[in-house]
């Protein structure tokens, strides 16, 4: 099949007026920055399945998401994960001994705490009899932690699960070069002074050059930012459109923060420093200021910049999920049901960031829903260009037929229902923790706005993606 990034896009809008085709007013207009009105909808069918246990979210919390290199810079990942767990315990008052299992997602592992879920659980005071494990699936690691928990509960293996995720980008592992590592290991095995001196004689100064963490995809040798730039170009997403969307994200996040809607954030007293109470990456600017920034990846003609990309972020999240009957027996009023979910994978070269486009129709079909049934959309915003490219792909019959094997397009999420309290562009994106934030945002929005169904979706490195249906718990 002709590569997606070289073939001309048939029946896809190719001008900056694509928003008119979608019946979307300019993203920067004030009407788009107001919170959406409560969804006036009749109660729809429930998605409960016969002979399968209902899994509910009791509540979820997260530490404030901070720009890397700021207040969390002297911590370790398990410190943040422990803070999220402690915050969850305080929020829910769940007895530690009733938790059957703890699962956390993370991407960049600290060698000292490779099973960060276990170390954080012990640090937060959970019983040493409570098992814990860590999963990694790039930007959908927390999603995998949650759905693993859903499976354990639905199958009857567990009743109470804590799922979450953590990422600390302020202190990523920087290794010695491979030659230096080999030399040091060989020196450790040497049995005589002669052997040691012989090995030392092989040392060269260039052995000291550090090995920085890879930022490119292993399978393609391309950075995600570079891929986002190519994807935006393939779908004719302009720089202005990307900046407008980023401005929308920051403006809505600031509004939600000021109005106290980001209730999943719990204060965290950083040892030796002040208490952190809110996300610090929310920075509404202006299109004029954003236009001054130079391309970050493809220079000089690229359209992806620091302003329309998510930033390196430190943070952790945690959720208490239970079998419905267990939650009710303990006196809890759950926030939402976790319903159908779907994982997808596609070409990591040309479709790296199109996970939401592929996962959305599959999870809707699995749940027996349509786009019109969804009251709250929460999509991970890696880049503005990624979001807008997914919009165009989802609104294209041609793309659906030629790349997805579908007869009709997926359909476009209504912008008035989309990421109404900001997204990863503004709130931040700690790789391993974002999935829980998305689900809690959907659950909290459904309660606030009066909707019934939420759709969470995210892309991930490796050309993978995830989507999940969240159903509001009856009030």
Curated annotation (Swiss-Prot):
One record GO biological process: fatty acid beta-oxidation
**Site annotated as Increases nucleophilicity of active site Cys: where?**
429
- Record's Gene Ontology CC terms? endoplasmic reticulum; mitochondrial inner membrane; mitochondrial outer membrane
Q: Which residues form a coiled coil?
A: none
User: Which positions bear N6-acetyllysine?
Assistant: 73, 189, 294, 299, 333, 349, 362
Give the matching SUPFAM superfamilies: Thiolase-like
Q: Where is this protein chiefly located?
A: mitochondrion
| GO MF terms held by the record | acetyl-CoA C-acyltransferase activity; acetyl-CoA C-myristoyltransferase activity
From what superkingdom does this record's organism come? Eukaryota
> What does the record give as the reaction this protein catalyses?
an acyl-CoA + acetyl-CoA = a 3-oxoacyl-CoA + CoA; butanoyl-CoA + acetyl-CoA = 3-oxohexanoyl-CoA + CoA; hexanoyl-CoA + acetyl-CoA = 3-oxooctanoyl-CoA + CoA; octanoyl-CoA + acetyl-CoA = 3-oxodecanoyl-CoA + CoA
Q: Which UniProt keywords apply?
A: Acetylation, Acyltransferase, Endoplasmic reticulum, Fatty acid metabolism, Lipid metabolism, Membrane, Mitochondrion, Mitochondrion inner membrane, Mitochondrion outer membrane, Transferase, Transit peptide
State its Enzyme Commission number(s): 2.3.1.155, 2.3.1.16
- Involved pathway(s): Lipid metabolism; fatty acid beta-oxidation
Where does this polypeptide localize? Mitochondrion; Mitochondrion inner membrane; Mitochondrion outer membrane; Endoplasmic reticulum
UniProt intramembrane stretches: 174-221
> Key word Endoplasmic reticulum present in the record?
yes
What is the active site of this protein?
Answer: 139 (acyl-thioester intermediate), 459 (proton donor/acceptor)
Q: One short Pfam family name for this protein?
A: Thiolase_C
Q: List-wise, which residues carry N6-succinyllysine?
A: 73, 189, 191, 273, 292, 294, 333
Q: Where is the transit peptide?
A: 1-34
Function as written in the Swiss-Prot or TrEMBL entry: Mitochondrial trifunctional enzyme catalyzes the last three of the four reactions of the mitochondrial beta-oxidation pathway. The mitochondrial beta-oxidation pathway is the major energy-producing process in tissues and is performed through four consecutive reactions breaking down fatty acids into acetyl-CoA. Among the enzymes involved in this pathway, the trifunctional enzyme exhibits specificity for long-chain fatty acids.
Family to which the UniProt record says this protein belongs: Belongs to the thiolase-like superfamily. Thiolase family.
The subunit structure is: Heterotetramer of 2 alpha/HADHA and 2 beta/HADHB subunits; forms the mitochondrial trifunctional enzyme. Also purified as higher order heterooligomers including a 4 alpha/HADHA and 4 beta/HADHB heterooligomer which physiological significance remains unclear. The mitochondrial trifunctional enzyme interacts with MTLN. Interacts with RSAD2/viperin.
Kindly provide the name given to this protein in its UniProt entry: Trifunctional enzyme subunit beta, mitochondrial
């Amino acid at each position: 099949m002709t590569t997606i990034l070289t073939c001309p896009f048939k029946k896809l809008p190719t001008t900056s007026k694509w928003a008119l085709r979608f019946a979307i007013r300019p993203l920067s207009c004030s009407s788009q920055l107001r919170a959406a009105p409560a969804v006036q909808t009749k109660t729809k069918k429930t998605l409960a399945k016969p002979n399968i246990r209902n899994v509910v979210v009791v509540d979820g919390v997260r530490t404030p998401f901070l720009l890397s290199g700021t207040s969390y810079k002297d911590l370790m990942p398990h410190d943040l994960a422990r803070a999220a767990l402690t915050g969850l315990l305080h929020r829910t008052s769940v007895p530690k001994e009733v938790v059957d299992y703890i699962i956390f997602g993370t991407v960049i592992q600290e060698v000292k705490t490779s099973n960060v879920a276990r170390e954080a659980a012990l640090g937060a005071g959970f019983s040493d009899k409570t098992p814990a494990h860590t999963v990694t699936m790039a930007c959908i690691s927390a999603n995998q932690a949650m759905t693993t928990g859903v499976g354990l509960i639905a199958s009857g293996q567990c009743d109470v699960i804590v799922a979450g995720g953590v990422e600390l980008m302020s202190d990523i592992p920087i290794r010695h070069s491979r030659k230096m590592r080999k030399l040091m290991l060989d020196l450790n095995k040497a049995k005589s002074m002669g052997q040691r001196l012989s090995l030392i004689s092989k040392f060269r100064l260039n052995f000291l050059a550090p090995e920085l963490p890879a930022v490119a995809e292993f399978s393609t040798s391309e950075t995600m930012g570079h891929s986002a730039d190519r994807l935006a170009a393939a779908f004719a997403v302009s720089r202005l459109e990307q900046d407008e969307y980023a401005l929308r994200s920051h403006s809505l996040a600031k509004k939600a923060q000021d109005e106290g809607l980001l209730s999943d954030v719990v204060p965290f007293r950083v040892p030796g420093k002040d208490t952190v109470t809110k996300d610090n990456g929310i920075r509404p600017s202006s299109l004029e200021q954003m236009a001054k920034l130079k391309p970050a990846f493809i220079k000089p003609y690229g359209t992806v910049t620091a302003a329309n990309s998510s930033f390196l972020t430190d943070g952790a999240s945690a959720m208490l999920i239970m079998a419905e009957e267990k939650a009710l027996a303990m006196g809890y009023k759950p926030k939402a049901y976790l319903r159908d979910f779907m994982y997808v994978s596609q070409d990591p070269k040309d479709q790296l960031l199109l996970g939401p486009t592929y996962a959305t129709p599959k999870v809707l079909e699995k749940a027996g829903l349509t786009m019109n049934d969804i009251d709250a959309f929460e999509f991970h915003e890696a880049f503005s260009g990624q979001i807008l490219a997914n919009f165009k792909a989802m609104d294209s019959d041609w793309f659906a037929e030629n790349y997805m094997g579908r007869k009709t397009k997926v359909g476009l999420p209504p912008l008035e229902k989309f990421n109404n309290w900001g997204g990863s562009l503004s709130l931040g994106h700690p790789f391993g923790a974002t999935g829980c934030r998305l689900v809690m945002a959907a659950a909290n929005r459904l309660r606030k706005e009066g909707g019934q169904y939420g759709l969470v979706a995210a892309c991930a490195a490796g050309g993978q993606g995830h989507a999940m249906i969240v159903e509001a718990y009856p009030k």
